[in-house]
Amino acid sequence: MGRISGLVPSRFLTLLAHLVVVITLFWSRESNIQACLPLKFTPEEYEKQDNQLVAALCLTLGLFAVELAGFLSGVSMFNSTQSLLSIAAHCSASVALSFFVFERWECTTYWYIFTFCSAFPAVTETALFIAVFGLKKKPF
C-alpha cells in the first residue's frame, strides 16, 4: 500500500477548511444576497436570490458528502492524483469563498467557484468509486 505521505492530512484539512467557509457563508449570506440585488429591491427578489444561494450551498454540501465518503472509506485516500486535485480545488475554494464572504461578491460568482472547486473534484471522486467498486481496480 505504500507509506502515508503529507497528502492525506493536507487533503483532510483543506476539505475541512472549505466546509467551514461554506457553513460560514450559510450564516452570513445576507450581505452577499444584497450585493446581488439592485439598490431598491422587492422582498420577492430577495427571497429568490436567497433561495438560489441556499440551493447552491446545499449542492456544495451534498458534494462534500460524496468526497468525504470516498476519502474516509479509503477509496481515494491514498490516490495521489485525486489527493492533489482535491487539495488544489479545496484550497482555492477556501480562499475564493473567503473573498466571496468578505468582499461581498455577486452570487453568480459562486457558481464558478462551485463548478471548478466542488463539482469537478466530486466527479473525479465518483469516477474513482466506479473504478474501484464497478471495475474492481485498486484505488491507488
Curated annotation (Swiss-Prot):
Pfam families cross-referenced by the UniProt entry: TMEM107 (PF14995)
Location within or outside the cell: Membrane; Cell projection, Cilium
Residues the record marks as carrying a glycan: N79
InterPro entries: TMEM107
Record GO biological process: cilium assembly; cilium organization; craniofacial suture morphogenesis; detection of nodal flow; determination of left/right symmetry; embryonic digit morphogenesis; neural tube patterning; non-motile cilium assembly
GO CC annotations on file: ciliary transition zone; membrane; MKS complex
Membrane topology, record value: Multi-pass membrane protein
Segments passing through the bilayer: 7-27, 53-73, 83-103, 113-133
Keywords for the protein's UniProt record, in alphabetical order: Cell projection, Cilium biogenesis/degradation, Developmental protein, Disease variant, Glycoprotein, Membrane, Transmembrane, Transmembrane helix
Primary localization class, coarse: membrane
Function as written in the Swiss-Prot or TrEMBL entry: Plays a role in cilia formation and embryonic patterning. Requires for normal Sonic hedgehog (Shh) signaling in the neural tube and acts in combination with GLI2 and GLI3 to pattern ventral and intermediate neuronal cell types. During ciliogenesis regulates the ciliary transition zone localization of some MKS complex proteins.
PANTHER family in alphabetical order: TRANSMEMBRANE PROTEIN 107 (PTHR34341:SF1)
Associated disorder: Defect in TMEM107 is the cause of the schlei phenotype. Schlei mice display Shh-related defects including, preaxial polydactyly, exencephaly, and disrupted ventral neural tube patterning. Mice shown decreased numbers of cilia in several developing tissues and organs. However, nodal cilia appear normal in schlei mutants and subsequently, no left-right defects are observed.
Oligomer and partners: Part of the tectonic-like complex (also named B9 complex). Interacts with TMEM237, TMEM231, MKS1 and TMEM216.
Protein name: Transmembrane protein 107
The species this protein was found in: Mus musculus
